[in-house]
Curated annotation (Swiss-Prot):
Name of the protein in its database record: S-adenosylmethionine:tRNA ribosyltransferase-isomerase
Catalysed reactions, semicolon-separated: 7-aminomethyl-7-carbaguanosine(34) in tRNA + S-adenosyl-L-methionine = epoxyqueuosine(34) in tRNA + adenine + L-methionine + 2 H(+)
Pathway: tRNA modification; tRNA-queuosine biosynthesis
Species of the source: Pectobacterium atrosepticum (strain SCRI 1043 / ATCC BAA-672)
GO process annotations (BP): queuosine biosynthetic process; tRNA wobble guanine modification
Subunit description: Monomer.
Family membership: Belongs to the QueA family.
Subcellular location field: Cytoplasm
Encoding gene, per UniProt annotation: queA
EC number: 2.4.99.17
A Pfam family that the UniProt record links to this protein: Queuosine_synth
An example Gene Ontology molecular-function term: S-adenosylmethionine:tRNA ribosyltransferase-isomerase activity
Major enzyme class: transferase
Assigned GO CC terms: cytoplasm
Alphabetically ordered keywords of this record: Cytoplasm, Queuosine biosynthesis, S-adenosyl-L-methionine, Transferase
Length: 355
């Protein structure tokens, strides 16, 4: 399967650089998987598309201010992007510098260069850094870090991004990118969903910087996914099984919720799904057999990205690419701060030919 099959033309003007004034004020393109039919609307239309007893599964990760600027004590400037917090004093990070720091290199981090750190070891493309500070890592990042806006949002981060690039239900710090489908849910929307009898459950997947890495191979099967830490606790498993038993739908809010639930299903030995705590490298592309998800809320994804492949595996390749062409023609806003889709599963997607 060719990566190029997932390309589409996207005018630069359709990339959203700022969010909507109201979280739930975005547009919603609904794609009916079985028929391929498209419906244009607004995000609050989602209320009418869900039935009492349906289960929405959210990702409650919280974005950390993971981008740091500074220099080596010896002089060279550098930029640090945290990939993972290892413990209270150590991180794994991407480091951009004219010359990669060697083990033992001392760093001065923060806009005022007030925080000392040491490069301890290199692990492939990532650097292990130790903060020489009495505060824990998250406190340091909150004090000196910048919000890690995606590379396609071509502007410096602003103070407002600390909350805007964050879901209202985020609880577990550790992500370096927001689970962006969740950005559209505000408190009134969540209250309206509860009032209608929609069930809710929360997984955790700490989105890594690898989510923005382009696919660098020509053939999809050759791509190796980055690892991300995910948790699907027992209460989520119970909610999913109860939802299925009563004949309702499991609806994932975002591709990270999809990947968490499907990882838990893959790891389960004898039940449809079991609790999951650990790294996942699940790569979902056409031909994948979905085990848990019946519908999906998601944003519009980058051309040739693993996420448009995931959507194609769910809704069908032709359905997905047609929907994206329609979204471009109708000038929907794309990517993290953009508009949303509501998609139901196509039973034919698994067998469909790509290209």
């Amino acid at each position: 399967m060719r990566v190029a099959d997932f390309s589409f033309e996207l005018p630069e003007s359709l990339i959203a650089h700022y969010p909507q004034a109201e979280r739930s004020g975005c547009r919603l393109l609904s794609l009916d998987g079985p028929t391929g039919d498209l419906t244009h609307g607004v995000f609050t239309d989602l209320l009418e598309k869900l039935n009492p007893g349906d289960l929405l599964v959210f990702n409650n990760t919280r974005v950390i201010p993971a981008r740091l600027f500074g220099r080596k004590v010896s002089g060279g400037k550098l930029e640090v992007l945290v990939e993972r917090v290892l413990d209270d004093h150590r991180i794994l990070a991407h480091v951009r510098a004219s010359k990669a720091p060697k083990p033992g290199t001392e760093l001065l981090l923060g806009d005022d260069e007030s925080v000392k750190a040491t490069m301890v070891a290199r692990h492939d493309a990532l650097f292990e850094l130790h903060f020489d500070d009495s505060r824990d890592v998250l406190s340091i990042l909150n004090d000196i870090g910048h919000m890690p806006l995606p590379p396609y949002i071509d502007r410096p981060d602003e103070d407002a991004d600390r909350e805007l690039y964050q879901t209202v239900y985020s609880q577990r710090p550790g992500a370096v990118a927001a689970p962006t489908a969740g950005l559209h849910f505000d408190e009134p929307m969540l209250a309206a969903l509860r009032a209608k009898g929609i069930e809710m459950a929360f997984v955790t997947l700490h989105v890594g910087a690898g989510t923005f890495q382009p696919v660098r191979v020509d053939t999809i099967e050759d791509h190796i996914m980055h690892a991300e830490y995910a948790e699907v606790p027992q209460d989520v498993v119970d909610a999913v099984l109860a939802c299925k038993a009563r004949g309702n739908r499991v609806i994932a809010v975002g591709t990270t919720s999809v990947r968490s639930l499907e990882s838990a299903a893959q790891a389960s030995q004898d039940a449809p799904i079991a609790p999951f705590f650990g790294d996942t490298k699940i790569f979902i592309y056409p031909g994948y057999h979905y085990r848990i998800i019946d519908a999906l809320v998601t944003n519009f994804h980058l051309p040739e990205s693993t996420l448009i492949m995931l959507v194609s595996a769910f809704a069908g390749y032709q359905n997905t690419m047609s929907a994206y062409r329609e979204a471009v023609a109708e000038q929907y806003r794309f990517f993290s701060y953009g508009d949303a889709m509501f998609i139901t599963h196509s039973p034919m997607a698994e067998q469909e030919k790509v290209g």
